[in-house]
């Protein structure tokens, strides 16, 4: 297999939206090969929270502008941007409270000091299965096959569909035959039961794409997050 490959994460488009200057072009300086896995973000609350559904969360936020809170792992993080996107589409003003990481946010949720948590499926699904969190919604286009009882955000707010992802890139200008060969190899790899199980263990679903589909995903996410940053006046770094 071609050895000069690197993983690109869903944080790439978000960093483009939140940073003032980049020393590279976020699209042209990467040779897209394929996405390899997607996994949803999860909106959840403590098991003891009176909020039972995502619709109830939105209703509470509408009734209490600026008082219903959501956590993230930092200003400008995907967690933060997703929460603000929900604010925009729902017409609410949930208060953003940033933390240094998921464990700190989790402690505040469990202590009742923050209303809702926006976190990766990797972290959230384990806490939901363990009975500590109640999943209100997943951000993916449809329900996760891993936890199908949790509704999608779009069931309440049509239009909000977002999945975290990992993808493979090579140097720009890599010959197309090499890119196509890599794409075929990753597609075969992702069809294996072993890889499907490994990804499932952290809330992910293996999904390959064409180089063009991966590029389009990145361009769309850059545009979306820039819009969120502009509308919510999030300070660029």
Feature locations, PLM:
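Hydrophobic residues within well-ordered alpha-helices
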Residues: 83, 109-110, 128-131, 182
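An extracytoplasmic/periplasmic, membrane-proximal ligand-sensing/linker region
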Residues: 88, 129, 176-237
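Conserved helix-loop-beta element of the AMP-binding
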Residues: 31, 57, 132-144, 162
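Hinge/capping helix and adjacent helix->loop/strand transition within the periplasmic-binding protein
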Residues: 3-4, 17-104, 153, 158, ...
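Short secondary-structure boundary segments
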Residues: 10, 47, 121-122, 140-141, ...
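N-terminal (or domain-start) structured segment
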Residues: 1-28, 67, 91-120, 127, ...
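Short, charged, surface-exposed secondary-structure boundary motifs
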Residues: 105-108, 145-149
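Conserved functional loop/turn residues at catalytic and ligand-binding sites
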Residues: 53, 98, 112-113, 132, ...
